[in-house]
């Protein structure tokens, strides 16, 4: 998978997740921040905490860490599938 394709797939996953049920098109800013976090972090638990913090900063509500961890795992899988390194 190409990296640009991977980024598009990650953004789709975040949109479909729709954690606050505001509609899939509502999370553009957060999606960009989360994708950046995916490329900064390889540990799913740390990524989940980053995702939780990104959404808490934007919406002043704390998402369940289990939900963030599930999304983190999906996003890291996509990132690792697009990687050209062994």
From Swiss-Prot:
InterPro entries: Apc36109-like_dom_sf, DUF1871. SUPFAM superfamilies: YugE-like. It holds the Pfam family DUF1871. This is Uncharacterized protein YugE. It comes from Bacillus subtilis (strain 168).
């Amino acid at each position: 998978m190409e990296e640009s394709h991977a980024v598009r797939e990650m953004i789709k996953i975040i949109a479909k997740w729709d954690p606050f049920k505001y509609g899939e098109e509502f999370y553009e800013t957060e999606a960009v921040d989360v994708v950046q976090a995916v490329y900064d972090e390889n540990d799913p638990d740390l990524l989940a905490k980053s995702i939780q913090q990104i959404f808490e900063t934007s919406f002043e509500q704390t998402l369940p860490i289990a939900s963030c961890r599930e999304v983190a795992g999906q996003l890291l899988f996509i990132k690792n599938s697009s990687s050209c390194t062994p």
